[in-house]
């Protein structure tokens, strides 16, 4: 296995969450073993782009992946954590760089090792230096560079590592169990906090996502643009943001293509999943489906109708079992043309 040093940084949203998630995802690969993690640091941004401070750390990993294979997997991890490459040296949810790959010197079109900017970046070298033994090939050059950069205007200081979201949820669930009169240490509840944390990771998986990108567009004969494309009875499950109780039901989604652009049929259910897997209300889910579909497809019109049962209505309060809430939202021709709107509604009967 090859010893490799990675530098990681984040300056958007919950920075430590993205760093923890990146470490977790890297460690799940069967050919990567996380050996050491540095302290967490806060650093001022470089590169001249106005943005928030970064949280940085370094990893020492052992890997069986070749350098370009490792780079490809790193890009997959970054993409899964909502990394967008819009501004060079700009803000990002996560940035992972290969700094050293053993003692190798690599000159590829998309990979240079040692990283070409490493010896100019205090936030790269200082965390990595924590992880090195003094027989490492670049130990002395790194030590000398740190001494020089420490006299520059680059700001860097150690910060406290925060608890992971999983640990926070587990501790909160234990407190809730105490508060309702339970004993979280009794046999039936010992693993409940961990189960709840894992459940929230699944059912609120869109909570930190800002863009829907699980789709592909296709072209068809533009003469068929007036035909309505409808997918109905799409199941969804979500969590009410008012009481954190489930609500669930079916979504019916239609659009009228424009310019021959259509979206893969399976992507509309994926869109419904995306908007529903976070704390929300039914009205927002209805609008979000229509707005996102309009943004990515630019159709002539979009129609969405959502039917839902709400546990905050059925389990508590008024306790009206089996009551059904319907919400609808129309854009473009569905909003302006009553015949098109009626065609959509009649197709649901």
UniProtKB/Swiss-Prot annotation:
Classification via Gene3D superfamilies: 1.10.286.10, 3.30.1130.10, 7,8-Dihydro-6-hydroxymethylpterin-pyrophosphokinase HPPK
Domain of life: Bacteria
PROSITE patterns (alphabetical): GTP_CYCLOHYDROL_1_1, HPPK
Catalytic reactions of this protein: 6-hydroxymethyl-7,8-dihydropterin + ATP = (7,8-dihydropterin-6-yl)methyl diphosphate + AMP + H(+); GTP + H2O = 7,8-dihydroneopterin 3'-triphosphate + formate + H(+)
Entry keyword annotation includes Nucleotide-binding: yes
Coiled-coil stretches: none
Annotated keywords: ATP-binding, Folate biosynthesis, GTP-binding, Hydrolase, Kinase, Multifunctional enzyme, Nucleotide-binding, One-carbon metabolism, Transferase
EC number: 2.7.6.3, 3.5.4.16
Ranges where the record places region 2-amino-4-hydroxy-6-hydroxymethyldihydropteridine pyrophosphokinase: 1-226
GO CC annotation: cytoplasm
The family this protein is said to belong to: In the N-terminal section; belongs to the HPPK family.
Subunit structure comment from the entry: Homomer.
Protein's UniProt name: Bifunctional protein FolKE
Protein source organism: Lactococcus lactis subsp. cremoris (strain MG1363)
Lineage: Bacteria, Bacillati, Bacillota, Bacilli, Lactobacillales
Gene name of this polypeptide: folKE
